[in-house]
């Protein structure tokens, strides 16, 4: 049986916290898991958090430096589109999963759309009142499937014109992590 190849895109510790639970629940006998590590993960000034992502031993990792400390968002976006587009043309994923409203997710969504690769946007439909909201809604429109955290977000995505059958309310992905015993007693 051929395994389905799924790429997860992560640019920050925060989005990886949301994606890690989804990565863990995938059956290794059915899915080949790949993690595209970029963004703030790669910068020492943000703690070089790529080291945390690399602890996922049952997933393949690729690292892509998409920015220097003083790069503007448009520069980061264009570098990430080019790097991620090259990557998906090489690995030919069946599906790409990204989270939220960051420039790395926008770049992945654009690369998937222009290369006809199916994609999933996690936590679209949220409101922030910042530039990130524009990114989030753009990412939603570029995505094929949507995993949302509440009915309000689902309704916003439907108002954007997306097919209700492609929107699944899964709740907030990191709640599963927080519901487990951390080993720390109070």
PLM feature spans:
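Short glycine/serine/threonine-rich phosphate/pyrophosphate-binding segments
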Residues: 15-19, 102-109, 154
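Hydrophobic/aromatic ligand-binding patch that stacks against planar heteroaromatic rings
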Residues: 25, 108-112, 138-139
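A conserved, positively charged/aromatic
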Residues: 128-144
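Conserved nucleotide-sugar phosphate-binding/catalytic loop shared by glycosyltransferases and other
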Residues: 32-76, 83
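A nucleotide-sugar donor-handling region in carbohydrate enzymes
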Residues: 9, 42-44, 142-186
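Short N-terminal targeting/anchoring amphipathic segment
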Residues: 86-103
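N-terminal subdomain of nucleotide-sugar transferases
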Residues: 1-41
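Active-site proximal beta-strand in glycosyltransferases
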Residues: 111-125
């Amino acid at each position: 049986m051929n395994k389905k190849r799924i790429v997860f895109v992560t640019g920050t510790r925060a989005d990886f916290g949301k994606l890690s639970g989804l990565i863990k629940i995938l059956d290794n006998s059915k899915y080949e898991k790949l993690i595209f590590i970029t963004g703030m993960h790669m910068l020492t000034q943000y703690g070089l958090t790529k080291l945390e992502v690399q602890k996922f031993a049952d997933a393949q990792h690729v690292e892509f430096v998409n920015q220097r400390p003083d790069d503007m968002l448009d520069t980061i976006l264009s570098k990430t589109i080019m790097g991620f587009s090259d990557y998906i043309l090489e690995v030919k994923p069946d599906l790409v999963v990204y989270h939220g409203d960051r420039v790395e997710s926008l770049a992945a969504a654009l690369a998937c759309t222009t290369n006809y690769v199916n994609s999933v946007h996690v936590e679209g439909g949220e409101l922030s009142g910042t530039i990130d909201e524009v990114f989030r809604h753009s990412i939603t429109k570029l995505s094929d499937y949507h995993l949302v955290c509440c009915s309000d977000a689902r309704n916003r995505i439907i108002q954007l014109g997306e097919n209700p059958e492609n929107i699944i309310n899964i709740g907030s992905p990191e709640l599963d992590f927080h519901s487990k015993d951390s080993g720390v007693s109070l």
